[in-house]
């Protein structure tokens, strides 16, 4: 084979980046998967409760929290594009303590975080089981449970609206039905289905599922907000939005300081630690790095790299728009539906409470629509996080020496682990028998504490690894990157302090 033939063979998979709108849209995808995995337990539960607690006044912070982490996300993607290196291998190159020929300090913290992410997945699976039981109980016990919980939550709502009826509703308020086996049966069925889909499915299927689910919960969210606008007592006014965008802080929330409330809200939204690591893997599978080609510092390679990094940025910012819209919507639902009557339901009853509040105004069909939207949100997180984490775990295990550390083996074990992951989550849900919100919280704490570490890595990638001048970001981008990292440090250290000494 001649040298020219070898060169052509090496570059046969490269592709010039698209410039037309249709071409760009065709090559988007990784960000939609990330959007689907983000808008789950955090946005549905924590953001809605934050809106209920603070009212409209923290809306500005919710928006900033969604936007600001994208700069770190893009730096992770940029590094992968330049060096064709997976994120875990890149993180293992960050200076610091390291086991000889093995994993460094970042990967050890990641290992702890990942163990708790599986627990979180178990909690989300339980929440999905509860949502399914609401609309389709499988046993008579489930039907009775739904009726008793409906009676109890309606009593809670009426008492919140008019405390004088508390005595009349005493019996209903004291109802405490045992959870039916329907929840576990639904969880088992969903875990088995997800395991099969993930094991046999490839990137195309995962992207398709994420697109359908993201589209589903986005449409449902629009419907929910539109219905609220038809009722004067629930409608969101211009004054409400103006207050939410005034950069103010609440005086106190149930005795909690405004700083505490603001930091808590900032920490639960936008791209989390797990998603920051997962994103470049989806970029690799979409082909961004392959289309760019192996680095040779030629003018052609630099041109392709610059163009595909542009596509990556568009993808990241598009996904940000999707999950920011959904996050804002859930925050407004909390501020409007719960905040105005000062009702703070238990996290495990949040979906049921919101669904019940729609019934007197819009009828039973409104509850079913809301619960379907909640299911789409929760299942997208469960399914897509399992798909993403399997790729990260396979790569990480190779660096720890548990698996052979090469690309072929990584891809093979990614598929195997993706099939096992939902079953592990199911086992933890059934074995631990904890409330879903408790299981979700455990993982959330470690992910927030991981953010400063990833901030350090992003700065290392930017200033030590982005050595091609044509591919370096602008000065303005660098400013926002530092702001992003500063925010991640603030929330990470605040969370550690709050949990240890708060």
Where are the regions a protein language model picked out?
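Flexible loop linkers connecting adjacent transmembrane helices
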Residues: 8-13, 47-49, 74-102, 129-144, ...
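Transmembrane alpha-helical segments of multi-pass small-molecule transport proteins
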Residues: 137-199, 215-222, 411-427, 451-460
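Juxtamembrane transmembrane-helix boundary signature
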Residues: 34, 61-96, 109-123, 384
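Hydrophobic alpha-helical segments and their helix-loop junctions in multi-pass secondary transporters
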Residues: 215-257, 262, 272-281, 454-468, ...
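Membrane-water interface regions at transmembrane-helix termini and the short interhelical loops
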Residues: 130, 170-175, 190-213, 219, ...
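Membrane-interface "cap" regions at the ends of multi-pass membrane proteins
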Residues: 1-43, 104, 306-318
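Hydrophobic transmembrane alpha-helices that form the core helical bundles
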Residues: 102-175, 378-398, 436, 489
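C-terminal membrane-solvent junction of multi-pass transporters and transport-like membrane proteins
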Residues: 203, 209-212, 395, 401, ...
